[in-house]
């Protein structure tokens, strides 16, 4: 987990490269089409929505993949995990092969799921999984006042409000009179 610009995508790219080098099958998924597309573009691998990965059947409102027919993967990486609700996560866990690894990637301070539950936060709080929290801002994100301000706010600090509209900054404070 970690905020914007801390290297979550870089870590996922490295996981995919390492697993591929070991001839292991990696499935990449995200809760939305847009997030899946970004995940695929950033890793150079095929990524899909969780519903597509689990082979959602609209007629029966169920998934074809489950304990009876697990996913053909040695590892499953789910990005934007904060948007996954409990029902979808339950279906994913049920479809995991016994020996497969599950990697959950997301920012607990980002968009919550529309459906019930705060799965990523709950998994982290449970202590049942190994958690890596990335905190250092890298590359172009370090120059973005939006990213820096978001991190400051998450730490309970005030952002730098000195930027004037029309300047070189990407973050402005507009005073209301």
Where are these regions (language model features)?
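Walker A (P-loop) phosphate-binding loop of P-loop NTPases
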Residues: 5
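Short, conserved "post-DEAD/DEAH" coupling segment immediately C-terminal to helicase motif II
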Residues: 86-100, 118-123
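The Walker A (P-loop) glycine that initiates the GxxxxGKT/S ATP-binding motif of P-loop NTPases
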Residues: 1-2, 30, 80, 106
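Conserved lysine of the Walker
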Residues: 8
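Post-Walker A helix-loop "phosphate-sensing" segment adjacent to the P-loop in P-loop NTPases
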Residues: 17-27
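Hydrophobic positions on the alpha1 helix immediately C-terminal to the Walker A/P-loop
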Residues: 11, 15
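Conserved P-loop NTPase motor core of helicases/translocases
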Residues: 25-30, 34-95, 136-137, 146-147, ...
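Conserved helicase motor core of P-loop NTPases
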Residues: 108-177
């Amino acid at each position: 987990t970690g905020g914007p610009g801390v290297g979550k995508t870089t870590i996922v790219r490295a996981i995919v490269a390492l697993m591929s080098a070991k001839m292991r099958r990696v499935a990449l998924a995200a809760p939305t089409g847009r997030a899946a597309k970004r995940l695929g573009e950033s890793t150079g691998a095929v990524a899909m929505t969780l519903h597509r990965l689990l082979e959602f059947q609209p007629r029966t409102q169920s998934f074809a993949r489950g304990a009876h027919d697990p996913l053909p993967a040695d590892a499953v990486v789910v990005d934007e995990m904060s948007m996954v609700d409990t029902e979808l996560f339950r279906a994913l866990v049920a479809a995991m092969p016994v020996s497969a690894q599950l990697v959950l990637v997301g920012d607990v301070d980002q968009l919550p799921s529309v459906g019930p539950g705060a799965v990523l936060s709950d998994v982290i709080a449970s202590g049942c999984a190994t958690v890596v929290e990335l905190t250092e801002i890298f590359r172009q994100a370090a120059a973005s006042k939006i990213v820096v301000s978001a991190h400051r706010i998450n730490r309970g600090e005030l952002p730098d409000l000195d930027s004037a509209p029309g300047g070189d900054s990407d973050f402005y404070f507009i005073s209301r009179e």
